[in-house]
Amino acid sequence: MKKKRYYVNQLALYKHDMQNTWKVLKQAMNISKNKSEITEIQFNDTIVDDVGNMANIFNKYFASIGKNLAEVIPPSTKHFSEYLGTQNPSSIFLAPTYREEILDIVSNLNNKKSPGHDDINNFILKGVISSIIDPLVHIFNLSLSSGQVPAGMKIAKVIPLFKNGDKLSVNNYRPISLLSTLSKVLEKIIYIRTIKFLKLHNIFSNFQFGFREKHSTIHALLNFIDKVAHAIDKFSHLVGIFLDFSKAFDTIDHEILLYKLSHYGVRGKALEWFRSYLSNRQQYVFLNGHASSMQDIKFGVPQGSLLGPLLFIIYINDFCRSSDVLSFILFADDSNLFFSHNNPYTLVSTINAELDKVTQWIRANKLSLNLQKTKYMVFSNSLNTLPINIVFDNTPLENVSHTKFLGLIVDNKLSWKYHIDKICKTISRNIGIINKLKFHFPPSTLLTLYSSLILPYLNYGILAWGNTQQTSLNRLLLLQKKSLRIIYNSAICSHADPLFIDSKLLKIGDLYQFNLGQFMYNYNRETLPHVFNDMFPKNQSIHSYPTRRSNELHLPLCRTVFAQNTFIYNGPKLWNSLNDDIKASPSLNTFKNKLKSFLLNSYSNAQNN
């Protein structure tokens, strides 16, 4: 009984944490971690099993990735600085840190993160912070004022993590970098000041959705849907090119990055600080309890760092300037290009000409593409096969019918068939887990598992795919009903609406409406990324004369059913249908509670009728 209560409490604690939920479930189901040590690898056609030699081989391989890629990049006809535009005349000032700021940063550190080479974990730091806060304030302020980063904060402890394929090949492992806890605190201090400055001066491209506050993969996906819908509604053909950069974070050129930082206003001591931060970095591999020798890191942004992602999006911020014709959607290194035209021959010739320009930007910035993994897709109403052949850097690209894009499987008809197949497969497996545990846990705990093992797959990207064909959505609804009947131990043929009401869970169709309502609430509160500004004007701004519905959002004219099924049309339609009490909610949480109650009430009303 005590053990059962422990698992119930743990699952409740990790309700919204998928990784830790799985850990608890594996404990409860007596599933071993099966985390075997690396016992041998292949190097120069020889099997190596000495742990010290293996650690050194791994370290040399990881440290050489950026250098090896940089050496084979052809020269560009352009200089990287030609793409940067007007220089920011303002310069950043690194204001000193203070006790309260450091205490706040430390208190928000995740206790479960592994320590770096100094073996000081976040839990220990939190325990002693009050005793060392004054020396830390002094050290960090000395770093800011001198433009120097302590050498001990520039060492990474690297753990090789197997991905897939042949376990003997070092190519099939990725490095997990663990940094000093104190370096993370210093990075956070710098991050706060840098991001505030860059936002103040509107440095970032509107088409960069990665690693930015109030920007997410969902916003990038909706921007993509918007482009496809507008093209198809105009009876044009749209080509999407899904780029695959080779080890982009590892190949960043430090001198180019520092030049761009200066261009955007990071100068003086601040620029010296970043130069110190990037230079003389070292790493070692820790394998099976043994440490390798040190290797210098001369390329890339520090993996596992807070500043790394920020520095990366600064580095590629001007990528959109490589073409004035193509549209861009960027999510860190997940970059995608789009162009539409009603004439397929003009479409192809324009894209291929513009891709030559994009190639020059990539070369000038010393990045490289994996052209075997870079694909393109044609979105069109045409039933005929279009004569479209796309060439990138003298290499013909593969035309695919579907591909993975920001966590969704996108197909060229946007039917979402492949993605829903994947969701159904994952949810079915997880329902099996809930079924195994139904006699060991009460319904309340099983509902927690539903929130961890089923709901995230239904919620993710639903604004993109959630209004697809009803036959596809019915497959998901049946799985929802099946899971609730298992949780409540109800008969297979029992009516499911009371179960949705009791659990306060929404059916898949209403889950789409719930997410769409939140998007529209944020639109009306002007908290969405800039690309959505003025997307849904009010009727009063369309008509020159007053109408009964002047304050409602204007419903766009959609020529195709495809466009009418997207958020472009359904967003304003839903918002106009909501009562004023829901729309006037003072906060997003209040709005969510009211909208959810409204949607759940429809189940009760359906029962009563």
What are these regions (language model features)?
Residues 43-48, 471, 477-609:
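Short linear motifs embedded in intrinsically disordered, charge-biased segments
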Residues 190-208, 238, 309-339:
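Active-site palm subdomain of RNA-directed nucleic acid polymerases
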Residues 247-264, 336-359:
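Catalytic palm subdomain of template-directed nucleic-acid polymerases
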Residues 62, 92-302:
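Conserved pre-catalytic core of RNA-dependent polymerases
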Residues 92, 353, 368-401:
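Short, conserved micro-motifs composed of acidic
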Residues 1-97, 522-556:
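Basic/polar low-complexity segments
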Residues 40, 62, 66, 106, ...:
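Short, conserved catalytic/metal-binding micro-motifs enriched in Asp/Glu and His
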Residues 398-463:
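Basic, alpha-helical interaction scaffolds
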